[in-house]
Design a protein with these regions (language model features):
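Conserved beta-loop-beta/alpha segment of the NTase-like Rossmann-fold superfamily
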Residues: 1-44
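A diffuse structural propensity rather than consistent per-protein peaks
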Residues: 6, 98-99, 171
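Intrinsic disorder/low-complexity segments enriched in polar/small residues
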Residues: 16-18, 135, 170-172
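Catalytic-core segments of class I nucleotidyltransferases/pyrophosphorylases
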Residues: 47-122, 128-150
Length: 175
């Protein structure tokens, strides 16, 4: 995924010794609104996390904090303790273990977990989201006055594949 965030605000959270774990979130992401059962959701009191719900929306997918898959544990030990507890209780969602779920274990262990809301979020975690990103990447490359160019991008579209040339190649109901 790609995102824009306030680095000064993040640095202040990192310097706060009362905070142990930061869960990065966004709100109102269109694909999560359409498919809330595909995402993790955070129940909070202010910015403090009460619980994380994986694959089960809370109250309102339009406004509830959405886990974007970025977590900041201030120490490896905090992650290990939380993950070990999750594994020991064998808490799985659809047969899988999720870092999202391990935040509930961190809360139970007494770690102070807070959310950090990003300013803008772009996901390419599903095939259609990736194709949409590739389409716009191709457009910006072809736009002569745009600063983006595949030649300057080490993560550019693979040379052995052709990028999409129109939105019609996407499943428009998933955009």
């Amino acid at each position: 995924h790609g995102l824009l965030f306030d680095s000064k605000k993040f640095n202040l959270l990192m310097q706060d010794e009362k905070i142990d774990i930061i869960v990065w979130v966004t709100r109102g992401y269109s694909n999560a609104i359409r498919n809330p059962e595909m995402y993790g959701w955070v129940d909070t009191n202010g910015n403090q996390i009460k619980k994380v719900s994986v694959k089960k929306p809370l109250k309102n997918p339009c406004t509830d904090p959405l886990v974007i898959g970025t977590f900041t544990f201030k120490s490896a030990e905090m992650f290990k303790n939380s993950a070990d507890r999750l594994i020991k209780r064998d808490y799985r969602v659809n047969g899988e273990l999720y870092v999202d779920s391990c935040i509930n274990d961190a809360v139970s262990l007494g770690y102070r977990c807070i959310i950090f809301e990003v300013d803008h979020y772009l996901c390419w975690g599903t095939p259609n989201e990736l194709r949409t990103f590739e389409y716009w990447q191709s457009c910006f490359h072809k736009w002569e006055s745009h600063p983006y160019s595949w030649d300057k991008d080490k993560w550019a579209f693979p040379k052995d594949r052709n990028p999409p040339t129109s939105l019609s190649k996407l499943e428009l109901n998933d955009i």
